[in-house]
Amino acid sequence: MVAALALASCAGIGTVSQEEVTSEAQRRGGGITTHLVDAAVEAVAEETGRDPLPVHSIFATLAQVTITVPSADGSPGRDVWSYGTSGLYGGRGLTGPAVAGESAAGTFAVATGDLDVDAAGATARDAGGPGTWVESVTIARPGEGAEPVLSVVVTDGATSQTIAVEGSR
């Protein structure tokens, strides 16, 4: 009887829609929002004592942000910080730094309020067409000396496309 109940409750796992997952992440304080990215930038800046924060890249998914910054000890390596707001897709709060290898890309300064992820997501969803949702957001320099680019990956569940969003920084 217990096994049948467990099996019956597992049968519903595959029927959860992306909208339900996104709604649940938002309810728990997550989602890919300007607020989430600002909270992550603020947490790393506070922990490292750097404001504005020198950044190699920022990668945001549902309720989780990963920020790569120059190593705090001045070595050519990078420190990788993770910030999550939801138990649904990872831990709560700030974790790190994990040490990564050297980076060829230069840094750019980011302070709370510098990035409008909400507007970039809306622009990308419009470009992606009906029924698309934001899967991830990346902010990085495409090369040394280049301006940072905000790229948004949108999907309809079957296919994904990356859209570079102008003027989001």
Predicted regions mapped to residue ranges:
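Sec-dependent N-terminal signal peptides
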Residues: M1-A4
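C-terminal motif of bacterial Sec signal peptides marking the signal peptidase cleavage site
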Residues: A6-S9
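Bacterial signal peptide processing site
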Residues: A11-G14
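A cross-kingdom feature marking solvent-exposed beta-strand/loop segments within repeated
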Residues: V21-S57, V134-V137
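N-terminal non-globular leader segments, chiefly Sec-dependent signal peptides
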Residues: A25, S82-Y89
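Exposed beta-strand-loop-beta-strand "reactive/processing" segments of non-cytosolic proteins
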Residues: A43-W81, T138-V165
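Long, charged/polar, surface-exposed segments that mediate recognition or autoinhibition
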Residues: G87-E135
